[in-house]
Amino acid sequence: VEMDYAPAAATAIESFLETAGFDYAIGSVHYVDGRHAFPFESFADDGDAARDAFVDAYYDAVVSLAESELFDVLGHVDLIEDHPALRGRTTDAHRRRVAAACAETGTIPEINAGRTGDRGEFDDLHPAPPFVETFRDHGVRFVVGTDAHDPGDFTGRLDRLDRFLETTGIEPLPLSAVVG
């Protein structure tokens, strides 16, 4: 299951996951302080400082997600890079903090194909290449996911994931490394 993560809801999330019996759980940050990290949230009235503060808060929540150890997998770690108003605001410091938290806790980041195909406006994956390299520098391995919300999304996204893995030489962890 993929589940939203908010630091204030960690106790409720833990209770839910303990009783739900899922084989594994993907945690993702979709909202920060009541605002969407998705491209349909407007930041038009926000200046650079407010946008940077939102990005900082987003990555604080991502680090909190990893440190909570509630989830096996960290989903689309750099979701905010999809947002035109936030794209390019992820810093090396953000990437290092997230990678260090994943390395320390064993939370496995997902190479996610949700930015590709009909739903995505890019031919890119999550995380972006600088994030992939930072994870690799920290010895963090990956799982892969299509983020398919419709069966028709699988084929093209699987092809894109295969090309990416072949190009980068990344050997993802098998599902058995996540389950159980």
List each language-model region with its residue ranges:
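Charged catalytic cores and adjacent phosphate/nucleic-acid-binding surfaces used
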Residues: 86-180
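Extended substrate/RNA-proximal surfaces in nucleic-acid metabolism proteins
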Residues: 1-105, 166
